[in-house]
Regions:
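Short edge-strand/loop segments of extracellular domains
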Residues: 128-133, 348-354, 415-418, 548-554
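Intrinsic-disorder/low-complexity, polar/charged segments enriched in Ser/Thr/Lys/Arg/Asp/Glu/Gln
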Residues: 3, 48, 94, 107-111, ...
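Acidic, small/polar-enriched beta strand-loop surface segments
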Residues: 41-50, 60, 72, 86-90, ...
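Surface-exposed coil/turn segments at beta-strand junctions on protein surfaces, enriched
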Residues: 27, 77-79, 103-105, 139-142, ...
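Extracellular and organelle-lumenal recognition/adhesion modules and their flexible linkers in secreted
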Residues: 41-194, 285-298
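Assembly/oligomerization scaffold segments
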Residues: 1-42, 174, 194-241, 258-469, ...
Length: 730
């Protein structure tokens, strides 16, 4: 988190104050970034290609309107060998580049070198669309000159332009384009601006205070939390199956996991629809929560027990039409049966019975049908070669697509794989849309074909799904075998977390199936990271970051900061204690082994120091390896430097590096006093507290030894020696 005290004397940060320049946008969850820019070092906010065009493209430059033609050119160049050619053929036109990421109220200087290709036509100017232009325009011909414009950003997004006024027909050239903070026109460079990000988060609330009791002193002391807070507060997750289905936007989805007291089933996609029990002729039973579903959702399923094919109970409901003007559908369900007769798992049809049916035939084969009581020539069936009425749980799906030229195609999928031979029927070639499929029947139809067994997770979609293999994996394995980074990405996708805000190391551990029902996204991700034995955090740029466990024993990792003991805070202390020491450890995994390992020598010296760890890996070998690795790292006390305060502002040679520290950074201290066990300390940052104010800039890091034990590294001396303390890494 970040705490900021901001001056609000002008009322700019007062919520709902109409005179605020930000009105009405001062709200909770406003995004705040804390960055540092060394004003003495020039830099370019534009990319190298947008600045110098040496890659052979026009970058993201574009024209304001017709009458301007842009191209990459080697005919002229102010620097390098290429530039942006701008062919004018009209008046009041501009070549411009959109730039996003400006800070409202901050001063910037925009500049470019322009080669004016002749004496006729308009002079060339430079400016920012919607703000203004420089009063100085080009006064040269057939040579290069530099134009610049200093402005204050009024939006996060602006168009930076090079423009003409009067009618002009000639070709000019642009090169050496540069955007930088401040009002000083610096020498051109393609080096990125030296901006250091220290925090990125969202305001919890906007408090307004008057410390002096009057209008002359108003402040807002805000608390800002990073994305971890948002992930912790996000909606709780549903089952792995429901979350996977949601990625494909079902029109309706009935998990059928209601309690035994239920008489109806509810939709989880948001349509508000329900399914209720209906009798066909006489007899039979339909009991909620009396069976089990796929197993990966940890939920029950209803059991259908009819008297025979034409007597029993089924579920019936009406759902809003999915994609009313569309020509494509997918119908899916999870079911278990061993009955060899014509059975309907789920039917999706209109009020007259025109629609799709998923079921089995009298031989136990899976079938998908398109039925049309008004025109039986359109009736088609796809039948699987294998028998799936085999007492096992299977995922069934049918897709219906229309090519817009008069042909519809029906396909059958079982367990994520297409089965049987696709069937086609003809439709109108122009303007064809599907009947209004609204009626949903589960476990039978109004005319019979009653189902015996369990059914769950019936769903309908307004598209032809290409992800049915994922649907089957969700229902069969729960994606067991995902790497740790893949599982975190999967969880993120369930809550629409942007991929651009993730930076995940490739995981070293595979994750087992986990019932995600009721979990918060952050706690689930953290369980994955703990199983990886890695670190999951939000970095200083606001990006969700995973460091895999390999980083924990990477002896070749670069040193981020190296300082002399003479310049660190005098309050620094070394300590060696039993905090964190474990010599009797039990590691277990859900649905798998539980392993206990003990370091007898450590127990003899320090007494029993026990701990239990639960992981969600998918291998019992991982359990054993994790237990031995934890014991190797933690059974003996190490010398720690728990807190290290560093100067991030004035210390020559190291202040800039300190401003770049983050979780996982490597810090080395040289020249330790003679009383220390070693003349140097090699440390890993596990967390930190940063203070920035009029009195200076300090960073107090919580650290641990960079390598708690020495890893065995083959072909390395001394790490490759097997007769020393080097240990095989987990």
């Amino acid at each position: 988190s970040c705490s900021l005290t901001l001056d609000n004397t002008d009322g700019a940060l007062s919520p709902m104050l109409a005179s605020s320049p930000y009105y009405p946008n001062v709200k909770p969850q406003n995004r705040i970034r804390v960055t540092h820019r060394d004003p003495s070092v020039p830099g370019n906010l534009l990319s190298a290609e947008n600045s110098s065009f040496e890659g052979g493209t026009t970058g993201t430059w574009t024209r304001s309107a017709s009458g301007v033609t842009l191209a990459n050119s080697s005919a002229q160049a102010w620097t390098g060998t290429k530039s942006l050619s701008v062919a004018w053929s009209s008046s009041l036109k501009a070549a411009w580049i959109p730039y996003a990421g400006l800070v409202i109220g901050r001063t910037y200087t925009w500049s470019a070198y322009v080669y004016v290709g002749g004496v006729t036509g308009s002079s060339v100017g430079i400016g920012v669309a919607g703000i203004g232009a420089s009063g100085t325009r080009s006064s040269w011909n057939n040579t290069w000159g530099r134009l610049s414009y200093t402005f204050v950003a009024t939006s996060a997004n602006h168009f930076l332009e090079v423009s003409i006024i009067g009618s002009t027909t000639r070709t000019d050239y642009v090169d050496g384009a540069m955007l930088d903070e401040g009002s000083t026109l610096a020498a051109f460079t393609t080096t990125p601006a030296p901006i250091v990000h220290r925090f990125d988060g969202y305001v919890d609330e906007w408090p307004i205070e008057w410390p002096s009791g009057g209008d002359n002193d108003s402040r807002s002391a805000v608390r800002v939390f990073d994305l971890q807070s948002r992930l912790s507060r996000a909606r709780t997750l549903d089952s792995v199956i429901t979350e996977t289905y949601r990625l494909d936007s079902p029109g309706w989805h009935f998990p059928l996991d209601e309690s035994s007291e239920s008489a109806s089933a509810g939709d989880r996609s948001g349509s508000g629809s329900t399914l209720e029990a209906r009798q066909v002729n006489t007899g039979g039973e339909l009991t909620f929560a009396s069976g089990t579903g796929p197993g990966t959702d940890g939920a029950s399923a209803p059991t259908f027990a009819p008297v025979d094919r034409y007597n029993g109970l089924y579920l019936l409901g009406i759902a809003p039409e999915v994609d009313p003007l569309g020509r494509h559908r997918t119908l899916s369900a999870v079911a278990l049966t061993s009955t060899l007769q014509h059975q309907c798992i789920v039917e999706w049809c209109d009020a007259y019975g025109v629609g799709i049916i998923l079921g089995t035939n009298s031989s136990g084969n899976a079938v998908a049908k398109w039925t049309n009581p008004w025109d039986t020539s359109k009736n088609v069936t796809v039948t699987s070669a294998s028998i799936y009425a085999d007492g096992q749980t299977h995922t069934f799906a049918a897709t219906l697509s229309n090519d817009g030229a008069g042909t519809s195609t029906l396909r059958l999928y079982v367990d994520g794989v297409e089965r049987g031979t696709a069937a086609t029927f003809t439709t109108a070639a122009i303007g064809y849309i599907l009947p209004q499929l609204k009626r949903i029947s589960v476990g039978g139809t109004a005319f019979g074909d009653m189902f015996t067994g369990t059914i769950s997770h019936v769903a309908g979609y307004g598209s032809v799904l290409t992800t049915l293999a994922d649907h089957h994996a969700a229902a069969s394995t729960g994606f067991a075998g995902d790497r740790s980074d893949e599982r975190i990405e999967r969880i993120a996708s369930w809550i629409d977390f942007p991929a651009a805000l993730m930076n995940l190391d490739v995981g070293d551990t595979t994750i087992g199936h986990v019932d995600s029902t009721g979990k918060s996204p952050w706690s689930y991700m953290q369980d994955v990271a703990d199983t990886e034995a890695g670190v999951l955090f939000i970095d200083t740029t606001g990006v969700l970051t995973l460091h895999n466990r390999t980083r924990g024993y990477d002896s070749a990792a670069a040193v981020d900061v190296s300082v002399s003991a003479e310049v660190i805070d005098p309050d620094v202390r070394l300590a060696s204690g039993i905090a964190g020491v474990v010599n009797d450890i039990t590691v277990s995994r859900s649905g798998g082994a539980s392993v206990r390992v003990v370091d007898a020598a450590s127990v003899s010296t320090y007494g029993v120091l026990g701990e239990s760890i639960s992981i969600i890996g998918d291998s019992d070998l991982d359990v054993l390896n994790r237990a031995n690795w934890e014991l190797a790292m933690r059974s003996t006390p190490v010398v720690k430097l728990p807190e290290l305060t560093l100067d991030g502002l004035t210390e020559p040679g190291t202040a800039a590096a300190v401003r770049g520290l983050d979780i996982g950074s490597r810090v080395q201290i040289t020249g330790m006093p003679s009383q220390a066990p070693s003349s140097a300390a090699d440390l890993r940052v596990q967390g930190y507290t940063e203070r920035i104010g009029a009195g200076g800039w300090t960073l107090t890091a919580n650290t641990t030894p960079f390598l708690p034990i020495a890893p065995l590294i083959l072909d390395d001396d001394p790490r490759g020696r097997t007769d020393s303390t080097n240990r095989i890494a987990y």
